[in-house]
Amino acid sequence: MDEAGSPAPAGTGGGDDPGGSTRETSRRLSREQIFVLVSAASMNLGCMMTYSILGPFFPKEAEKKGASNTMIGMIFGCYALFELLASLVFGKYLVHIGAKFMFIAGMFVSGGVTILFGVLDQLPEGPIFIAMCFLVRIVDAIGFGAAITASSSILAKAFPNNVATVMGSLEVFSGLGLVAGPPLGGLLYQSFGYEVPFIFLGCIVLLMIPLNLYILPSYAQESDPGKQSFWKLVTLPKMGLLAFVIISLSSCFGFLDPTLSLFVMEKFSLSTGYVGLVFLGLSLSYAISSPLFGLLSDKMPTLRKWLLVFGNLITAGCYMLLGPVPLLHIKSQLWLLVLVLVVNGISAGMSIIPTFPEMLSCAYANGFEDSISTLGLVSGLFGAMWSVGAFMGPILGGFLCEKIGFEWAAAMQGLWTLLSGVSMALFYLWEDSTARRRSKAQNSLGTEEERAALLPNDT
């Protein structure tokens, strides 16, 4: 697409061009756009279900096999580390591989290894079990990294003026996957044992592949990104701060995977099935609130940055209350824990949804062209930074819970989002101040030029 037809600085990334966004939303969705939505929704739902089923029962099962809390955290965390590497590679080479092929292949790998994870309980306890858990999770992460990178790029290409709205709406399906995964996994585990949850959900993902092969459109490959350097993108100051925001939010989610279920079981003596319902508070509120924040981000782009900032600050407060931190002298109660998780889900949607369009706007404002290659780079960066946090969260969470307990560990986790929220607030205030000074200087220069032009006429 040439520069005249490019929605890059304006429409892309959240509706900086209200006119373009209105024209886009006023038209009915094309058949191709509907198919893209169906494909992305099926991937979000299936992969999030397979990702989230581990929470309620795997930590306890791994303990039986001789894994420590730190090792369990590393099993959760290695997924994110290799999703990070996969996102960087696949984002860079999206143009060469092809978005549709990458999407389908990623789903196939993820579904297949999920089934394999279901037979790991047949292995002897100790190093063999732990090593195979790492191996299967690593391959699953590579598959998911491919699928999510391709999905983000396809969505941004199909909906250039409504990225936040579409991604926020699709987070409903991510949320549904996160909502359905833990209770469904816990129920199947209690009823049928370790194998059935993985085999059942792995088969669901594999059954979605023929549908996506048929309906997902193929976008014409463009030229090599060439000068569109990933490192140029990453070294932009605003992009670096946005990356820090993503890492801090992702690490908060990752922190809960190996720690929350054990804390709830020990503190409130809940069964595995009820632990899955506790996870429901976070996932359901995130799924419900995400479309609203996506719509707000596109319709009111100036509000986007403050949604991001306040979402981070609220998330920090939630993690202080999750234990709660002993300094507050508040008794830990189940209703309070669930309430905090619900608020955390809303604040997470407030922070996460505006981030991707902010990244796109930053890239386009700094000379990156509107193309599938740029979308691949931004999608890869988003996925990579999310994976950094998702890698650090479980490992640090498992380690800190062993050393200082869940209450203090959660409070320390909240400091991440507090720091990222304050950093972004300071940057946006500086950015606004700089823009105002530049505007005043331009107005002053224009006035001087007008006066100079009028002087000869007065004489």
Swiss-Prot record:
Chain positions found as Phosphoserine: S21
Recorded topology in the membrane: Multi-pass membrane protein
Cytoplasmic compartment residues: 1-33, 92-100, 149-167, 217-235, 296-306, 355-379, 431-459
The keyword Phosphoprotein appears for this protein: yes
Comp. bias regions, Low complexity: 1-10
Record GO cellular component, one term: secretory granule membrane
Cell location: Cytoplasmic vesicle, Secretory vesicle membrane; Cytoplasmic vesicle, Secretory vesicle, Synaptic vesicle membrane
UniProt similarity note: Belongs to the major facilitator superfamily.
Protein name in the entry: MFS-type transporter SLC18B1
Originating species: Mus musculus
Organism ancestry: Eukaryota, Metazoa, Chordata, Craniata, Vertebrata
